[in-house]
Amino acid sequence: MKFKNFIAIICFVFLCGHSVLAQSSINEMVKEWERAKAYTKEYLDAMPDSGYALKPTADMRSFAEQMLHLTEANYGFASAATGEKSPIVRGEAEKAADKSKSNVTKMVMAGYDFVINNMRKMSPTQLNENVEMFDRFEMTKSAALAKCFEHQTHHRGQTTVYLRLAGAKPPQEKLF
């Protein structure tokens, strides 16, 4: 009987510990997204108003379009991963008529808030649920959010060149 109680206690401690670790994982993800939001804001602030229309070559996106593409994907990935309906229609952000510094900044920050606020609502169990992305890629919701993070990092990184071409100094790396 004592052995059964011991096993029951061990199982209980393990399950509680696992739950705490999983919740910790969500908290860490939120912390990373908050850092990414702040870092992206530094990029948006560093670009002069006149640089928002800058295209390194004719066939590339402008700085504003890069940032709007980043936020478009943030909404899309996060909506699929969290199950929350995106407040914007697919393609709407990138096609925004107002590509001014103030409007782009407002839209991009709102996109980060959508991701962060909806991640906070997720349970650890939901992170392990599967979701199909773009009607062909099956992955866990956690993996979808990681892909989203990778995507925003990629496009923010691309804008470093835009800042330099505009004569602006890119923000220092913000790993922590």
Task: Provide a role label for each language-model segment.
Residues 39-42, 46, 110-118, 158:
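Solvent-exposed, charged/polar functional surfaces in cytosolic regulatory/catalytic domains
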Residues 3-5, 19, 38, 157, ...:
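Hydrophobic alpha-helical segments, especially transmembrane helices
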Residues 12, 46, 69-72, 110:
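Residues within well-ordered alpha-helical secondary structure of globular protein domains
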Residues 30-34, 41, 49-92, 132-176:
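Short, contiguous alpha-helical
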